[in-house]
């Protein structure tokens, strides 16, 4: 099944339903379908083998997803926040592309590629000779570059079948109520942005786009557009909670708030649940290579865990929930042995929505179709999945493997800690040492030794940070993932400076 069919189903069922609200632009499903046909005609006439998009999103993302599909070529939304050199390097890795670019990023793209402005593409699509085909479901529909927080960005190839398997396996067609609206503020170059466009269109929800995130504007849009569902990343949730606390807003129309993209501190989750008791919170865990979500902590899971006196149940608030029905999971030891409940190892996943294929590398699935996520994980006896961070982040201190997440989960519970990251810069004596980078809570002045004592009291002595340093903010990417390499580089450089 191709993603073209998702739009065909939506537009033929209710062509007059509002599909997109992006600033002053409003499009019905019928209008989106017509523009996609015209956009496909533009792409086909250009002779391009690939469509690249450099921009903040809004209506352009769903339009280019479907226009590219109907032209029979893949599309790649790119990170518009990259440097000009970084952006051009990624475009150069795409085969014979046409680059659709928002005006403010035109200079960054440069003159070395075939380029058309987003506004011009939209205008020409209204009158272009249409083209519409349903591509081979096994052909590549979307290529996304990984964030590159631990290595150089890889180009993940997602087929139409990968994407539609995720949508049809997790969303019921036309299941939304007539007044339902989804607020989308995740970046277009992230898998969450792609899946939000496809899943909300398929469900029948109006999509309200906020292309430049601002917490006050987010709250305003929820209230004025009667938003019923939204998806945010941890840094966004933190800012939204701050605004809600200041304003006392209750957001009565909001029924579901999904969060994901990176680990969320439990005190923040508890605060959000306290401020919005009528909202169903969803923790969604997935990867680019899995076409989005593969495990979900449901609203009921949140409520039960928050209100439970049973430590084993309350602990679930820190999990990513249970795998979705279409996904199989295994936890494996380093030697490939499949581990049992409660044992920690690398997470492997399998399912129709799982790609595991990279441009220039090929498939990394094993002979039985399992994908190595590189995430350290544990599956408990009730099927709840706990993610302990990336295997690449593991600190090896004096020959002992230490998961940063274990220490971070303790530190963030200290009342004087708003956020933290634990990293392992190299050390001539220990191989690596444990350094906790802490963002203090507002109005507090935490002392390094107090925080070290706090960790030591709850974990083994070998888990106690060797050093504690303070920062106003942690460096993160657009989805809230901490840029650990930047922290390690900064700490290593500081260690080399003369006293």
Identify the meaning behind each predicted range.
Residues 202, 227-231, 243-314, 328:
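Gly/Ser/Thr-rich phosphate-binding loop
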Residues 28-31, 141-168:
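Conserved AMP-binding A3 loop
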Residues 3-4, 128-145, 152, 175-181, ...:
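Conserved pre-ATP/AMP-binding loop-to-beta segment of ANL
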Residues 103-138, 310-311:
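ANL superfamily adenylate-forming
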Residues 82, 230, 351, 356-357, ...:
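AMP-binding/adenylate-forming catalytic core of the ANL superfamily
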Residues 25, 40-82, 401:
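Conserved AMP-binding/adenylate-forming
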Residues 164-181, 189-229, 243:
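Conserved AMP-binding/adenylation subdomain of ANL enzymes
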Residues 319-326, 334-368, 402:
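Conserved ATP/PPi-binding loop(s) of AMP-dependent carboxylate-activating enzymes
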């Amino acid at each position: 099944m191709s993603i073209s069919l998702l739009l065909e189903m939506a537009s033929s069922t209710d062509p007059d339903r509002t599909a997109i609200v992006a600033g002053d632009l409003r499009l019905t499903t019928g209008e989106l379908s017509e523009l996609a046909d015209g956009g496909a005609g533009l792409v086909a006439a250009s002779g391009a083998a690939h469509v690249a998009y450099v921009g903040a999103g809004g209506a352009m993302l769903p339009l280019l997803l479907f226009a590219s599909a109907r032209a029979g070529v893949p599309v790649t939304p790119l990170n518009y926040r990259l440097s000009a050199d970084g952006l051009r390097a990624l475009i150069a890795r795409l085969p014979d592309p046409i680059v659709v670019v928002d005006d403010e990023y035109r200079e960054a793209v440069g003159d070395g590629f075939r380029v058309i402005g987003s506004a011009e593409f939209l205008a020409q699509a209204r009158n272009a000779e249409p083209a519409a085909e349903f591509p081979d479901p096994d052909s590549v529909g979307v290529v996304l570059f990984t964030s590159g927080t631990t290595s150089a960005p890889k180009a993940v190839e997602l087929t139409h079948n990968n994407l539609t398997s995720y949508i049809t396996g997790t969303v019921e067609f036309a299941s939304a109520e007539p007044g339902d609206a989804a607020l989308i503020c995740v970046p277009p170059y992230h898998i969450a942005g792609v899946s939000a466009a496809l899943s909300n269109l398929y469900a029948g929800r109006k999509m309200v786009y906020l292309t430049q995130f601002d917490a006050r504007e987010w709250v305003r849009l929820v209230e004025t557009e009667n938003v019923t569902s939204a998806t945010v990343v941890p840094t966004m949730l933190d800012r939204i909670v701050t605004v809600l606390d200041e304003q006392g807003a209750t957001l009565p129309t909001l029924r579901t708030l999904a969060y994901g993209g990176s680990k969320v501190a439990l005190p923040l989750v508890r605060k959000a649940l306290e401020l919005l008791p009528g909202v169903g919170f969803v923790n969604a865990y997935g990867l680019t290579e899995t076409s989005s979500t593969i495990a979900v902590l449901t609203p009921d899971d949140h409520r039960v865990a928050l209100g439970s006196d049973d430590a084993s149940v309350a602990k679930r608030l820190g999990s990513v929930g249970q795998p979705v029905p279409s996904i199989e999971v295994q936890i494996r030891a380093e030697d490939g042995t499949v581990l049992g409940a409660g044992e920690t190892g690398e997470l492997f996943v399998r399912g129709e929505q799982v790609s595991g294929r990279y441009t220039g590398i090929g498939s990394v699935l094993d002979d039985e179709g399992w994908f190595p996520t590189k995430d350290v994980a544990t599956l408990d006896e009730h099927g709840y999945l706990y993610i302990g961070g990336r295997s690449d982040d593991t600190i090896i201190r004096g020959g002992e493997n230490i998961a940063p997440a274990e220490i971070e989960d303790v530190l963030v519970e200290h009342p004087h800690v708003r956020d933290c990251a634990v990293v392992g810069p190299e050390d001539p004596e220990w191989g690596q040492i444990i350094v906790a980078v802490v963002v203090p809570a507002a109005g507090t002045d935490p002392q390094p030794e107090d925080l070290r004592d706090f960790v030591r009291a709850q974990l083994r002595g070998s888990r106690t940070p060797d050093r504690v340093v303070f920062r106003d903010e942690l460096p993160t990417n657009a989805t809230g993932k901490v840029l650990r390499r930047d922290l390690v580089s900064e700490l290593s450089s500081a260690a080399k400076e003369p006293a």
